[in-house]
Regions:
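N-terminal Rossmann NAD(P)H-binding glycine-rich loop of SDR-like oxidoreductase domains
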Residues: 1-23
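SDR active-site strand-loop-helix element
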Residues: 6, 45-49, 82-88, 136-138
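A short beta-strand-loop structural module common to alpha/beta enzyme folds
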Residues: 26-36
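NAD(P)H-binding glycine-rich loop region in Rossmannoid oxidoreductase-like domains
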Residues: 35-76, 89-90
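Conserved Rossmann-fold NAD(P)-dependent oxidoreductase catalytic core, especially the SDR/UDP-sugar
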Residues: 71-113
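Active-site helix of classical SDR
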Residues: 113, 117-120
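NAD(P)-dependent short-chain dehydrogenase/reductase
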Residues: 123-175, 180
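C-terminal substrate-binding subdomain of Rossmann-fold SDR/epimerase-dehydratase oxidoreductases
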Residues: 168-267
């Protein structure tokens, strides 16, 4: 089986490349300069291209990555399946406190450029009228080897290592997490074998900031403080019944990986 990964140098894409290769399948990972020049069948496309950490300062790159390249690939290339990697952030939009730009269709919720671009990408997939196009909304991903400090868990472990954690969200905040091993398996099978066009991807592991911080304090003897006026974000459990039924998916429980991950990332 042949796969093509766009965004193969990113956190998810790079891991996915190694995983699929280890399964014995062919993986084509075009360089950015070749994104718009492919004229062959790309097999099973997994679209991991995206901007996450500094998107507020990279508006043009964000739209280019989440929408413009997607438009080109759906319109101009041939493929056996196409899986657009979106975000579970869209399941939990934040309540708006500002009233500057407040489109009525979005009700009382914030409409930041990240969510807007992902929604545009999803809408394009749905209305492309192309066969076998899927959308996968992925929750917060945990890679026990990721010391980039560019996501919440990696960053907070780096802070613990230095001796002091400064929280930008409350201890009561809870989010959905998935181990990257589980994610890689699901992204490999959804394109070729998925029967639906939309999937929520999670693992029934909801973890609070409090649980993470308490473990890090025990592991590193660090201190922690919360910034003023921090917000509490409580995500509800993501419905993953479709991926459990279709792919015999049995998610790895946090009891297996959470503490080991915190130990490794805080070294």
């Amino acid at each position: 089986m042949r796969y093509t990964i766009f965004g193969s140098t990113g956190r998810i894409g790079s891991y996915l490349k190694k995983y699929i290769t280890s399964c014995g399948d062919d993986v084509y990972c075009p360089a950015r300069k070749d994104y718009y020049s492919s004229n062959r069948n790309l097999g099973h496309i997994i679209y991991c291209s995206g901007i996450t950490t500094d998107f507020k300062h990279r508006s043009f790159d964000l739209i280019q990555s989440h929408v413009c390249l997607l438009f080109h690939l759906l319109k101009e290339t041939s493929f056996d399946s196409f899986n657009y990697i979106s975000s579970s952030r869209l399941n939990f939009p934040k309540k708006s406190t500002a009233r500057k730009i407040h489109p009525e269709f979005y009700g009382d919720y914030e409409i930041d450029i990240y969510n807007a671009s992902k929604l545009a990408g999803e809408a394009l997939c749905i209305n492309s009228n192309k066969h076998n196009v899927k959308i996968s909304r992925v929750c917060h991903v945990v890679n026990p080897s990721d010391k980039s400090r560019q996501n919440f868990l990696s960053d907070i472990c780096g802070q613990a290592k230095s001796g002091k954690i400064r929280l930008n969200s409350s201890l009561k905040s809870k989010k959905n997490y998935i181990l990257i091993d589980d994610l890689a398996y699901l992204l490999k099978v959804i394109g070729p074998y998925g029967k639906k066009s939309f999937y929520n991807i999670g693992s029934n592991n909801i973890i609070s900031n409090e649980e993470i911080v308490e473990k890090l304090v025990k592991l590193t003897n660090c201190n922690y403080i919360s910034n003023k006026n921090v917000k509490t974000t409580i995500e509800s459990k993501i419905d993953i019944s479709d991926i459990i039924k279709e792919f015999n998916y049995s998610p790895i429980n946090k009891s297996v990986w959470l503490e080991k991950t915190l130990v490794n990332l805080s070294k």
